[in-house]
C-alpha cells in the first residue's frame, strides 16, 4: 500500500497531480442506481443519466439518459432470439468526442475496439417474452389477466429481468438468467451440459433430464461448479408462475405431447 494523493499546493509532489489517469484509478462506476441499464422497450435499453464511468484508465465519462437499440450493434442489424448480448462503453481517445455505446455478442470487447478503449458495463438476454402487467401477472391480447388465449401472448424481445449491470448481477456468469428478486437470479432454460462438467442455461440445447444416469446429488455438484444451486420450492413456484401447463396432444406450450418419442431442445 502507498499514499496515492497528497495535498500539495506547490504541485511539486507528483502525488498531488490529479488528472484523468489518476481519477480513472480511483473511479470505477459511480451510479445513482445499481440498475443503471434497464429494458425500456421490447427492443431497446436505456442507460440512466448521472453515471460516472472510467474506461481503460484514460477516459472518464458522465452519462446522459441514452436509449440503445439494434443500431448500436457492432455486427448485424437485429437482435437474435436466444442470444446473450453485452453492452460496452467505448472511448475513441479524442478529447472532444463523447462516449460511444456498443452492443455485442462478444464477451470480451466489441468488434473494432479493444480491451483498453472499451469497458463492459452490462448485458441482457434476447428471447421470448410473455405479456404481463406491472405485477408480472400474465395478460392476453386484450390485456385481461389470465384472459382467454393468455398462453399464446408471447413475443420476441429483450427479457426485461435479464438485464444486468456490474452492480446488479448474479455472482456466477449472468448468461441465460433472470432476476427473481431478493438478490436471487434463476436460469431461463432447463439446464444443459456446459462441456466443463458444469451446467448452463442456453437456448437450443438438449436439456439434462436425468436419463443420463444423473441423480439429485449430481445436479447439485454440477450446478455448484457453475456457481449456482438448485432452487428451493418457494423460489421454483415464484419463477414458474405464469408458465402455462403442457398439453397432452400438442407441444404448443412445452415439449409435452404424449406422442413425443424423445427429448426436445431448450427454448
Kindly give the residue locations of the regions a language model identified.
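Short, surface-exposed terminal/edge motifs of secreted or surface/virion proteins that either
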Residues: 15-17, 93-111
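N-terminal accessory interaction module
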Residues: 90-91, 122
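Short aromatic-cysteine micro-motif
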Residues: 134, 140-157, 162-267
Amino acid at each position: 500500500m502507498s499514499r496515492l494523493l497528497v495535498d500539495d499546493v506547490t504541485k511539486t509532489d507528483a502525488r498531488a497531480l490529479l488528472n484523468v489517469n489518476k481519477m480513472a484509478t480511483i473511479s470505477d462506476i459511480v451510479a445513482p442506481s445499481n440498475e443503471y441499464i434497464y429494458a425500456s422497450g421490447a427492443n431497446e435499453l436505456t442507460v440512466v443519466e448521472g453515471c460516472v464511468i472510467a474506461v481503460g484508465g484514460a477516459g472518464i465519462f458522465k452519462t446522459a439518459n441514452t436509449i440503445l437499440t439494434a443500431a448500436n450493434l457492432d455486427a448485424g442489424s437485429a437482435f437474435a432470439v436466444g442470444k446473450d448480448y453485452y453492452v460496452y462503453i467505448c472511448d475513441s481517445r479524442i478529447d472532444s468526442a463523447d462516449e460511444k455505446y456498443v452492443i455485442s455478442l462478444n464477451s470480451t470487447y466489441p468488434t473494432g475496439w479493444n480491451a483498453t478503449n472499451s469497458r463492459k458495463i452490462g448485458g441482457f438476454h434476447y428471447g421470448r417474452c410473455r405479456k404481463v402487467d406491472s405485477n408480472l401477472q400474465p395478460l392476453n391480447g386484450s390485456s385481461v389477466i389470465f384472459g382467454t388465449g393468455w398462453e399464446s401472448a408471447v413475443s420476441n424481445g429483450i427479457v426485461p429481468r435479464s438485464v444486468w449491470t456490474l452492480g446488479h448481477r448474479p455472482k456466477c456468469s449472468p448468461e441465460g438468467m433472470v432476476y427473481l428478486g431478493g438478490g436471487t437470479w434463476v436460469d431461463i432454460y432447463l439446464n444443459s451440459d456446459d462441456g466443463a462438467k458444469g451446467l448452463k442455461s442456453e437456448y437450443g440445447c438438449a436439456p439434462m433430464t436425468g436419463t443420463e444416469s444423473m441423480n439429485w446429488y449430481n445436479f447439485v455438484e454440477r450446478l455448484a461448479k457453475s456457481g449456482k444451486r438448485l432452487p428451493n420450492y418457494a423460489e421454483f413456484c415464484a419463477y414458474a408462475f405464469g408458465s402455462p401447463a403442457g398439453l397432452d396432444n400438442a407441444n404448443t406450450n412445452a415439449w409435452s405431447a404424449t406422442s413425443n418419442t424423445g427429448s426436445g431442445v431448450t427454448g
